[in-house]
Amino acid sequence: MEAVKDVLCMNNGVGENSYVKAEALTIKVMAITKPIVPKAVQSLFTETDHSIPLQVVNVADLGCAVGPQPLEFMSTVIESILKKCGEMGREMPEIQFFLNDLVGNDFNTLFKGLSVVQEKYKKVSWFAMGAPGSFHGRLFPRNSMHLVYSCYSVHWLSEAPKITNEAGLPLNKGKIYMSKTSPPAVTKAYLSQFQEDFSSLLKFRSQELAPNGRVVLIFNGRQTADPTNKDTCYTWDLLAEALSYLVSQGLVDEGKLDSFNVPYYNPSQEEIKYLVDKEGSLTIEFIDTIELEIGGPNGYWSSPESRIRGHRCFTEPLLSHQFGERLMDKLYDKATQILVEDYKHGKEATKNIGIAVVLKKKKL
């Protein structure tokens, strides 16, 4: 498989299965966690030397994707700065937004949507630019960023963990992620890859962060010590079952399924705290768990069809690259059939678990 940074993206365009149309879960999570951003902005202004007022505030949205999410974030930042400057009787600084994602992101659609923000804040001096690249590496100059934000992106790994035995044969057969039936080596490999990636992310953001700046990260996580619990693994188990069916029909090569693992990890709060402490350059100012009901008749996705569209918009690019674009409709149709049966018997995962953390640079 090619490097993740060259393959991973959300579904582009504005069609039924596009990220713009099908992904609304992140917007819901953003609404729940919205108060975090104004607090981070407030800290930036109250802790900065008043004798040297900020003239430009640099803000980054890492893994911004496309659609209403980055636009909502930009609006929240502008409103927060307007309010704080009004309270302090200070002149409004200029705001520079850096919209970051991998090169496959639909930046054209993203920038077309900026007209909404332009119309709303005509009297505010703000600017936006694309910053393509992986947040697992350096993106910005040292000490330059005042607010770095990411919502539902940093659970993506820089690469899929290497899960083979000494002979080079795949260990996670019939699966595309950790599961209850996966050997312990699979779980260990995923944790190791996440530890490496998250530690790098912390190191690079610390280098880029201005004094008194903040890093706000919101990402898929888990509440239990077991990384193979149902709420964590259900989506990937569902897709693996659908792929196994295609294998049984002779439509997918079994070796392609056995050798494929998604570059993704749901950490726990304990794992995050441990890695922040171990890396040592940042400190946790705030951390909390978000629980969103998504399954069943009263959940966020009340129908199997809407839930599969929500999954398809962020899983299809990876799966299409591995198994072929021509099979995607068959794959997600089969996944829908499986999910319909799971809904009937109450077997589907019912919760989406997120973790929100605010970080600041340690003072030397």
UniProtKB/Swiss-Prot annotation:
Its EC number is 2.1.1.159. Mg(2+) binds at residues 172, 258, 260-261. Pathway: Alkaloid biosynthesis. InterPro entries: MeTrfase_7 (IPR005299), MeTrfase_capping (IPR042086), SAM-dependent_MTases_sf (IPR029063). Its cofactor is Mg(2+). It catalyses: 7-methylxanthine + S-adenosyl-L-methionine = theobromine + S-adenosyl-L-homocysteine + H(+). Theobromine binds at residues 26, 152, 155-156, 314. The record marks 149, 220, 264, 325 as: Involved in substrate discrimination. GO terms for molecular function: metal ion binding; S-adenosylmethionine-dependent methyltransferase activity. It comes from the Eukaryota. GO terms for biological process: methylation. Binds 1 Mg(2+) ion per subunit. The keyword Methyltransferase applies. Keywords: Magnesium, Metal-binding, Methyltransferase, Transferase. S-adenosyl-L-homocysteine binds at residues 19, 64, 69, 101-102, 134-135. It holds the Pfam family Methyltransf_7. Involved in the biosynthesis of theobromine. Belongs to the methyltransferase superfamily. Type-7 methyltransferase family. This is Probable 7-methylxanthine methyltransferase 5. It comes from Theobroma cacao (Cacao).
